[in-house]
Amino acid sequence: MPFAKGARIEIENQTDVNIGAFYYYIDYVEMKELPKDMGRFHAWFNREITEALPEGETEWGSVGKQTENKDGADNYVFADIKGKGHFVGLNYYVQCPTPMWYGEGDDMWFIDGEKQASLIGTGTEDLFNTAWCPKEPYQHIYFGYPRVNNDVGFLGRTHVYRFFIQDPVFFEKGLKATIEHGHNNCLTLDLATVAYWYQDKATAVPTIPDKAGRKLKPMVNNVMMHKWRHEWRKNKGNKADLWGNE
């Protein structure tokens, strides 16, 4: 985290609990001057409860025909940068309220004001160097799945990360980095991200949500799912032998 004139790091307790002790240490190196091309480190937290399509959560064609995402206008935005720099990392947190796979969403990178993305991925897990709907914890220096939920399908909370140290995304004028929430943004998800990049100069980042805006949605559990089944049974006339695939 290079700095030329000074740096300030603040830690704020936004919980309702008093912290009796707080331990930390900071290492830094003093230099007479920085290299001329040394960028400035930036990080930005974003969160959104995404909205499903009007026709429903049609992932994998399970409840309706899948449609095409032609422009990425409704994608989740994890970086919206103005200026020159290079993108170096992403922490991605997803809470999925359905057992359906959350990761068919493609990443789309709009570089230097592009109207159409020049970098388009093939799925959320592919962006994080994995494949085939991973459900096992795995951690590497540059990518990993430190948290997964193996209760019921993909219901629950998952955390993945990737650092683009060996393959940064460069931009001259700006970068808008986005990802679909499900195929063509068909899923309601609780998404949160922290993006990391370097710019040629220190630049203010977009305002992050306040404490209330960062509060997670409650977990959907097996009891809630059974209540959904109960309502489905009532809609089917409460026949005694209803199974679930009628």
Sequence positions of predicted segments:
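Beta-strand-centric surfaces of beta-sandwich/beta-rich domains
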Residues: M1-E246
